[in-house]
Design a protein with these regions (language model features):
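Short N-terminal leader segment in a subset of presequences, especially plant chloroplast
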Residues: 8-17, 43
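The conserved cystathionine-beta-synthase
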Residues: 13-31, 38, 81-98, 104-106, ...
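A glycine-centered beta-loop-beta connector
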Residues: 27, 35-53, 94, 102-118
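Tandem CBS (Bateman) regulatory domains
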Residues: 1-10, 50-80, 85-95, 111-146
Length: 146
């Protein structure tokens, strides 16, 4: 099965210069946990911001989320796959890079969607492989320096 058959095609983004407070509010209103991050200079996707990025890299460190910007805490570089890739390729990328979401690109390398662990669970992926991916991305990474 192809990634385009299981991905979420409605793609919203946020700019690197958007405050974390505004970003968190946007995520809350959309009931989502991540957004692609776009550079205001060239309108290209340069990273991903997740609810976890906001909590771990900002709130837990005592930063002011009303003045700190997305570009300061986003995850980068991006983990991507193509819409015509097999679902197993997306799961392999998630497992290797320890991420829960992968940006989906078309044949012109333009963003067209996101594929998440939840999307994979809805597809025909082997349950043992899905379990392996979930375990790997859920294993704590080495702690970041303060």
């Amino acid at each position: 099965m192809k990634v385009k058959e299981v991905m979420s095609a409605e793609l919203r983004g946020v700019r690197t210069d958007t405050s974390l407070k505004d970003t968190a509010e946007h995520m809350r209103l959309l009931d989502i946990g991540s957004l692609p991050v776009v550079s205001p200079e060239n309108n290209r996707v340069v990273g991903m911001i997740t609810d976890r990025d906001i909590v771990v890299r900002s709130v837990a460190r005592g930063a002011d989320v009303s003045t700190q910007n997305v570009g300061d805490v986003m995850s980068s570089p991006l983990v991507c796959c193509h819409e015509d890739d097999e679902v197993e390729e997306a799961s392999t990328a998630m497992k290797a890079k320890r991420v829960r979401r992968v940006l989906v690109l078309n044949d012109k390398n333009q963003p067209v969607g996101l594929v998440s662990l939840g999307d994979l669970a809805q597809g025909p992926i082997d349950q043992a492989e899905l379990t392996s991916v979930v375990r790997n991305v859920s294993t704590p990474a080495p702690a970041e320096a303060p």
